[in-house]
Amino acid sequence: MRLAYVTETYPPEINGVALTVDRFVRGLRTRGHAVDLVRPRQPHESECESRSEWRSPGIPLPMYRDLRIGLPLISRLTKRWSVSRPQLVHVATEGPLGWAAIRAARTIGVPVTSDFRTNFDQYSEHYGFGWLRGIVGGYLKHFHNATDRTFVPTLALSKALT
């Protein structure tokens, strides 16, 4: 199977999502799947645009400087996937790059799946942005309901999207 895997976080970043995505991508490739990894380029990394990976331009998050979010370059993704069409686009994170991936996949008629693992709306209170909780929760619902399927680890998280 040929699939595109889109994430805002990937090693050398060290966090649960980055490490899980890395294991998943390596596992798919080991099993013979062609995986086009799309992720933001880190400051110390060179540009990379090959058949198996694209490091998109990105910007650092203000409160998490070690993490860069990808710019929402819909037309660039649409062109990339029109040339080398995946059978499926999977979006692991809900940032601008993930949203662009959903839009690009829809433009060329490729099915899209996503992961919902982190309640960022609940995190907003922890970081002093509790007033954003409803907005963030609404965005997460909108994001995941724009995909064909969303993978969740618990029934409670599934219900949070309805």
Model regions: which residues?
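Short, hinge-like loop/turn segments at secondary-structure boundaries
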Residues: 52-57, 107-109, 129-133
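An amphipathic, basic-hydrophobic alpha-helix
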Residues: 60-91, 96-103, 107, 134, ...
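Receiver (REC) domain switch-region micro-motif
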Residues: 3, 89, 150
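A generic structural signal for well-ordered alpha-helical segments
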Residues: 28, 101-105, 143-144
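Nucleotide-sugar donor phosphate/pyrophosphate-binding loop at the beta->alpha transition
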Residues: 111-113, 120-142, 146, 151-152
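N-terminal subdomain of nucleotide-sugar transferases
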Residues: 1-57
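Helix-loop-beta element that forms the nucleotide-linked donor phosphate-binding surface
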Residues: 158-162
